[in-house]
């Protein structure tokens, strides 16, 4: 089967930007324990099974420091250019510096395709 994943998240728990996964607890949305691990492009490739991944769109998952997330992602994904990846980055459009933030995001990667 061929797939384009239009919405996924990568993270490295050691970065401290996903505190909800550091000590997951069952709640109304379920048990996050299976997600409480690093998940990056290499893990995706190892766990995809028979799925032919034609492309992916990483959607911002670090609302606290989206610029740092984009810097990290471009480094992680640089080694996986064949994945045909794109980014939806975080920019708070209600802030006066939104244009500056968006310009910073776009300067970090030519693969920015959207804003969240």
Q: Where are the language model's segments positioned?
A:
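Helix-coil boundary/capping segments in enzymes
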Residues: 1-116
